[in-house]
Amino acid sequence: MSLYFTTLFLLLTVEMVMLFIFVLPLPFRIRRGIFSTYNQLTAKQQIKTIIFITGCLVGLLFIDSWKRSQIRVSLYHNDNSGSIGSSAVTPIQALASRAYNQRNMYISGFILYFSICIPTVMSIVKRLVKYQGLINEQEKQKLNKPSSNSKKDSNEADSTKLQEELRKKQISLEGLQKQVKNLEKYFDEKNQPGNVAAAEASKKGN
């Protein structure tokens, strides 16, 4: 197994693992963390350059392997007549070379395919994270509304209690005012001149 084939197979495995993790139904926090890490990595110019160069090399390997796998294998036969007959066979080395090129073509093709699938899946994950964040904010607002309503109810209860106390104090104040008026009326009647003379005459008679 050559070095570049090992590298290609490792790259394909990494892409498959990444795509498998991205499509898993993960919790919101983990998915948001993965998306943030992916954005931070892909935003760097060095990472973009590495991805571009790797994509170009894999694309060239795919084209070369495809061309080599399409080459027709020459036929030969075992006799020395030099003519091609029904006993013609295909060389084992040519078949092995074709299989080797086809294998490289499939691996490089899948690498290119997954390199397109990963950004597409991440765009979907981006929308999922965005909408899930909006849903969570709406749920928090709904949870905060009852507390505000309870505060409003408590304020209304306090206001009602204060109004009731104020009404009672007004009633007691009105009662005191009536008592004061009655006392003033009583003293006014007692202090009139006729009433004073009658009171003095009754005292002298006694």
Curated annotation (Swiss-Prot):
Subcellular location, record wording: Endoplasmic reticulum membrane
Transmembrane segments: 8-28, 46-66, 105-125
Comp. bias regions, Basic and acidic residues: 150-163
Parts of the chain on the Lumenal side: 1-7, 67-104
Key words of the record: Endoplasmic reticulum, ER-Golgi transport, Isopeptide bond, Membrane, Protein transport, Transmembrane, Transmembrane helix, Transport, Ubl conjugation
Residues joined by cross-link Glycyl lysine isopeptide (Lys-Gly) (interchain with G-Cter in ubiquitin): 190
GO BP terms: endoplasmic reticulum to Golgi vesicle-mediated transport; intracellular protein transport; protein localization to endoplasmic reticulum exit site
Membrane topology, record value: Multi-pass membrane protein
Entry-linked Pfam families: Bap31
Chief place of localization: endoplasmic reticulum
Membrane side Cytoplasmic: residue ranges: 29-45, 126-206
GO CC term, one of those recorded: endoplasmic reticulum
Disordered as annotated region, ranges: 140-163
Extent of motif Di-lysine motif: 203-206
Note: Present with 7210 molecules/cell in log phase SD medium.
Domain remark from Swiss-Prot or TrEMBL: The di-lysine motif confers endoplasmic reticulum localization for type I membrane proteins.
Protein family: Belongs to the BCAP29/BCAP31 family.
Biological function: May play a role in anterograde transport of membrane proteins from the endoplasmic reticulum to the Golgi.
Protein name: Endoplasmic reticulum transmembrane protein 1
Organism, as annotated: Saccharomyces cerevisiae (strain ATCC 204508 / S288c)
